């Protein structure tokens, strides 16, 4: 895994093999980034969220607490739910 500058990795958060996390990303408590995930700069991963293998989260994106991300998240998007769906652009 590679963590960028200024990443906030909270309690019990898990970043698995081959993940790339950009600069100034917040990964909330209990979030799980499974293998080969990518998170863009200035993004937020909510508590208990799960990113499935190979998922890419764009820059300035928000993943809500408890979301299960099974598809790529575009830049400047907010996703929520199980499975995660686009809720709005930010």
Residue ranges and their predicted role:
Residues 1-80, 84-87:
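Structural signal for interior beta-strand "rungs" in well-ordered beta-sheet cores
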């Amino acid at each position: 895994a590679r963590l960028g500058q200024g990443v906030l990795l909270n309690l019990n958060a898990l970043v698995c093999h081959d993940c790339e996390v950009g600069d100034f990303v917040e990964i909330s408590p209990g979030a799980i980034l499974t293998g080969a995930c990518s998170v863009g700069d200035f993004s937020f991963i909510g508590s208990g969220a799960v990113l499935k293998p190979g998922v890419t989260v764009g820059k300035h994106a928000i993943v809500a607490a408890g979301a299960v991300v099974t598809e790529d998240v575009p830049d400047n998007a907010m996703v929520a739910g199980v499975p995660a769906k686009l809720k709005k652009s930010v």
